[in-house]
């Protein structure tokens, strides 16, 4: 599923991401835009053999199990396929674990490069939330 900007913002808010660990909703919407272009089915293979999955491009080396990543830790205790669902609950729950891990949203390269230090409120402007 490809989410609309405000549709995604509303879903993320409902699932408790607004100001989770101090990151406003705009940060999460911005991250999703530049990680997956709001597409829940996005997958990208990394040079180390791991794969990033879903709307927030969660990595199989650490966070989920895809059965093909050597030494996978599966810290979110989920199959990576769960991160490709049109229902973003699994992605959000795992993202909460990731952002609590010490590096905050710096764990997402696209957030660090495209969202950090910008006017992220623009990503939810005009949305009925």
UniProtKB/Swiss-Prot annotation:
Pfam families tied to this protein: Lys
Keywords: Antimicrobial, Bacteriolytic enzyme, Disulfide bond, Glycosidase, Hydrolase, Secreted
PROSITE patterns: GLYCOSYL_HYDROL_F22_1, GLYCOSYL_HYDROL_F22_2
EC category: hydrolase
Catalytic activity: Hydrolysis of (1->4)-beta-linkages between N-acetylmuramic acid and N-acetyl-D-glucosamine residues in a peptidoglycan and between N-acetyl-D-glucosamine residues in chitodextrins
GO annotation (BP), single: defense response to Gram-positive bacterium
Positions of the C-type lysozyme domain: 1-129
SMART domains linked: LYZ1
Family from the record: Belongs to the glycosyl hydrolase 22 family.
Subunit structure: Monomer.
Protein name: Lysozyme C
Organism: Lophophorus impejanus (Himalayan monal pheasant)
Record lineage: Eukaryota, Metazoa, Chordata, Craniata, Vertebrata
Name of the encoding gene: LYZ
């Amino acid at each position: 599923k490809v989410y609309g900007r405000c549709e995604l913002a509303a879903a993320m808010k409902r699932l408790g991401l607004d100001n989770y660990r101090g990151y406003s909703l705009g940060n999460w919407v911005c991250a999703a835009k530049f990680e997956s272009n709001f597409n829940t089915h996005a997958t990208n293979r990394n040079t180390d053999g791991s794969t990033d999955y879903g709307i927030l491009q969660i990595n199989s080396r650490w966070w989920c199990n895809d059965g093909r990543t050597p030494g996978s830790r599966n810290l979110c205790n989920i199959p990576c396929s769960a991160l490709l669902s049109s229902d973003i609950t699994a992605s959000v729950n795992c993202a909460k674990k990731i952002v609590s891990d010490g590096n905050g949203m710096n764990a997402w390269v696209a957030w660090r490069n495209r969202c950090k230090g910008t006017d992220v409120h623009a990503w939810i402007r005009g949305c009925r939330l």
